[in-house]
């Protein structure tokens, strides 16, 4: 399933360099109405994630000014990052988010570990609603004798 094809992150720059200021991250959050950024190193490799929660927990909570803090000071690095793969199902992505109580998943290709997108909990809710509405429509059509079930077209 190409879940991330309809993601709100497909149309925006969702990456930020780890040496940028926390203020730059907040500016991107606000400009694109998103809540998470993939953090990259100098070679543009994804090394972490920076979310609104990271900002609140690490900048605002410690009284730092966001012009002083760098993205690398507040982001989540390494093995703590939970990722999805392009072929992951809606259910798999939802379980990953619920297991770690997170609201965003970076989409990484398993072959070369390349970041190809990002999913938000909002994207998963929209996909779930679409699936449920399609199921309801099919069942309603079946009940009414429509939809080609058992040659009743």
Predicted regions mapped to residue ranges:
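A short, polar/charged loop-to-alpha-helix boundary motif
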Residues: 56-69, 125-137
């Amino acid at each position: 399933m190409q879940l991330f094809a309809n993601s709100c992150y497909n149309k925006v720059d969702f990456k930020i360099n780890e040496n940028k200021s926390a203020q730059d991250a907040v500016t991107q959050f606000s400009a694109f109405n998103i809540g998470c950024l993939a953090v990259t190193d100098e070679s543009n490799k994804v090394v972490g994630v920076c979310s609104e929660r990271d900002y609140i927990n690490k900048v605002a909570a410690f009284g730092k000014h966001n012009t002083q803090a760098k993205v690398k000071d507040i982001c989540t690095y390494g093995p703590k990052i939970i990722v999805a793969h392009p072929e992951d199902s809606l259910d798999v992505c939802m379980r990953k988010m619920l297991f770690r109580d997170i609201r965003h998943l970076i989409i990484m290709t398993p072959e070369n570990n390349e970041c190809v997108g990002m999913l938000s909990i909002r994207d998963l809710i929209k996909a779930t609603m679409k699936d449920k509405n399609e199921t309801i429509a099919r069942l309603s059509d079946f009940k009414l004798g429509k939809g080609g079930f058992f040659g009743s077209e």
